[in-house]
Every structure is written in structure tokens, then in C-alpha cells.
């Protein structure tokens, strides 16, 4: 699943030549909490939230929104073709409510809200972990399924101290749902960190074998 599959396309977007009053009216109309500030080509230049707008004096309502926005350097972003797990990890790490979605050339094309991610994850909770590993396998190149399971056994030993064979690990993930795996790992972030670690170990072991064979 990609970030584009989670994003809200009906988002509030404020242009650099608009005023504070314009921003307030747009957020009210769209019923949104935050919005990106963009240039005429829809490239991100800043960010503003309702809480920040509430702190602005009425005498400043006609001033440019750019005087009150957060600069682009402080804005957490994701790309539309990023894996969905990347945005989940950013929500966990940075404790933000929403994140703008960019194209690779910097245009804002959507927003991902943490509430949307939660709804999507809720639908995924009954999916077997086996399917998530199959998706990982499809994305990490010329690693065989057996090599991925070997890496999973290595990472399990490293992280928990449990000795488990690759075959036993495969049987376990066939019987375990995404929801149960999150609970067993101690949270969503730890689950994805472990998953990423397995992929990295699989690639490292593959590279080591090639070097040894060469």
C-alpha cells in the first residue's frame, strides 16, 4: 500500500498571496484543522494550523498568511509513492495530526490525517501477517522467500532471544493476524521497525553470500 492510497484529495490549500482571513475562511469551509501554504505551481512553502490562526489578532487578518506560517523546513512531509508504513512511522515519531503528500517534484497533491490512517489500519487488523511479509518480499528485489524467512529468524533471535527456525517462523506468521502481531511487538512502531530490520538483514546476508562466492 502506498501513501497515495491513504491521502485525502479534498484538502485545504492556501496560496502565498492569500491573507490570514482567507486562510481562516477556507479552513472553516473545508472543515479542516491544518493546511499547506503553496506557490502558484502548488509547491510547498509553508504550513499553518487552526490553533496558530486562533492566536492571530483580528487587526492582522488582512496581512499575508506567509507572515504567520511555519517555514517549509519545519514541515513533515511524505511522497505519494512512499510505502504507507513510512507515514505511519512519521505520525508516531513526530506526533502530528496531518502530513502533506508531495509528488517527487515537490507539488502538494493531498494530505494524510492520522484519523484516516487509524481507520485504514483497523481494516487491516485481521489480515494475516503472512500477507504483509509477501508484500515485503515483492518489494525487496531478488531475495528468495526462504532467505527472507531465514532473516526473520535471525532478527527474532536478536530482538527477543527466542530460537526459532525459518520454517517455524513461516508457520507462525500464517496463523498470526496483523492486530495480534502489533500487540505482541509492543506497538505499531516496533512492528514496522522489526519488519524493516528483517528486510535489511535479508539484503545484507544476500550481499555477503555473493561476496563470499565471488
Curated annotation (Swiss-Prot):
Pfam family, one: CBS
Record domain CBS: where: 7-65, 69-129
Source organism, top-level taxon: Archaea
Keywords for this protein: CBS domain, Repeat
InterPro entries named in the record: CBS_dom (IPR000644), CBS_dom_sf (IPR046342), Diverse_CBS-Domain (IPR051257), UCP006591_CBS (IPR016486)
Acetylation is among the record's keywords: no
PANTHER family: CBS DOMAIN-CONTAINING PROTEIN (PTHR43080:SF2), CBS DOMAIN-CONTAINING PROTEIN CBSX3, MITOCHONDRIAL (PTHR43080)
Protein name (database record): Uncharacterized protein MJ1004
Source organism (scientific name): Methanocaldococcus jannaschii (strain ATCC 43067 / DSM 2661 / JAL-1 / JCM 10045 / NBRC 100440) (Methanococcus jannaschii)
Lineage, top ranks: Archaea, Methanobacteriati, Methanobacteriota, Methanomada group, Methanococci
Amino acid at each position: 500500500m502506498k501513501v497515495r492510497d491513504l491521502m485525502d484529495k479534498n484538502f485545504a490549500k492556501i496560496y502565498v498571496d492569500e491573507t490570514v482571513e482567507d486562510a481562516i475562511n477556507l479552513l472553516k469551509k473545508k472543515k479542516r484543522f491544518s493546511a499547506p501554504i503553496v506557490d502558484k505551481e502548488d509547491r510547498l512553502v509553508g504550513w499553518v494550523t487552526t490553533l496558530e490562526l486562533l492566536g492571530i489578532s483580528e487587526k492582522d487578518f488582512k496581512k499575508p498568511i506567509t507572515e504567520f506560517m511555519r517555514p517549509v523546513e519545519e514541515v513533515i512531509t511524505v511522497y505519494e509513492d512512499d510505502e504507507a508504513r513510512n507515514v505511519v512511522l512519521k505520525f508516531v515519531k513526530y506526533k502530528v495530526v496531518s502530513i502533506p503528500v508531495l509528488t517527487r517534484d515537490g507539488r502538494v497533491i493531498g494530505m494524510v490525517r492520522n484519523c484516516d490512517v487509524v481507520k485504514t489500519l483497523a481494516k487491516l487488523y485481521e489480515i494475516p501477517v503472512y500477507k504483509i511479509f509477501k508484500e515485503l518480499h515483492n518489494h525487496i528485489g531478488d531475495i528468495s522467500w526462504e532467505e527472507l524467512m531465514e532473516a526473520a529468524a535471525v532478527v527474532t533471535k536478536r530482538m527477543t532471544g527466542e530460537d526459532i527456525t525459518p520454517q517455524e517462523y513461516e508457520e507462525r506468521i500464517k496463523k498470526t493476524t496483523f492486530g495480534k502481531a502489533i500487540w505482541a511487538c509492543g506497538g505499531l512502531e516496533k512492528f514496522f521497525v522489526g519488519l524493516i530490520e528483517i528486510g535489511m538483514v535479508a539484503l545484507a546476508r544476500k550481499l555477503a553470500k555473493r561476496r563470499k562466492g565471488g
